[in-house]
Amino acid sequence: MSGDNGGGERRKGSVKWFDTQKGFGFITPDDGGDDLFVHQSSIRSEGFRSLAAEEAVEFEVEIDNNNRPKAIDVSGPDGAPVQGNSGGGSSGGRGGFGGGRGGGRGSGGGYGGGGGGYGGRGGGGRGGSDCYKCGEPGHMARDCSEGGGGYGGGGGGYGGGGGYGGGGGGYGGGGRGGGGGGGSCYSCGESGHFARDCTSGGR
């Protein structure tokens, strides 16, 4: 009980509440007395400084400039780092506040995120200069010599990679593509002609 790191006497208590967003809360001392104010700068932690409600803590008491007692050098039992609100809980901890930020714009779904939605990967098929099949500049997917294409090859679906949005984003995204922007033969999978002109005997 007298692990005196800061010269004062270590006391024990439990966290009454702690607002992670605002960075402060109160501790109820085990030996009675008034609840003590605690600021996140007084927390001994590995990483994000927060406290979980009802968490057992040890601390020292200091009188602040307004002559009020406050808890400082707050740690877990036996001087261990506090557990805190590292996963969420009341307003957030590490993730919480804006955590995961994936929904709306960017980051996955929505407008222009990494793959889905309107802009998707290739800028929504808005005439970029790189081939959707192989990623090389200088030619379009329909003229690409790399395999793919065909009924489900390459980007999957009818036109595999070619077409409106090509491999990933945009309108036709890998799936329907084809039709609208050239693409490959449905019968043999080769580019440069349509199924009705195919000489490979598919139909």
UniProtKB/Swiss-Prot annotation:
UniProt-listed GO biological process terms: cold acclimation; regulation of cellular respiration; response to abscisic acid; response to cold; response to desiccation; response to water deprivation; seed development; stamen development
GO terms for MF: double-stranded DNA binding; mRNA binding; nucleic acid binding; single-stranded DNA binding; zinc ion binding
N-terminal signal peptide: none
Compositional bias ranges of the Gly residues kind: 85-127
UniProt keyword annotations, A-Z: Acetylation, Chaperone, Cytoplasm, DNA-binding, Metal-binding, Nucleus, Repeat, RNA-binding, Zinc, Zinc-finger
Zinc fingers typed CCHC-type, residue spans: 129-146, 183-200
Localization in the cell: Cytoplasm; Nucleus, Nucleolus
Protein name: Cold shock protein 2
Underlying gene: CSP2
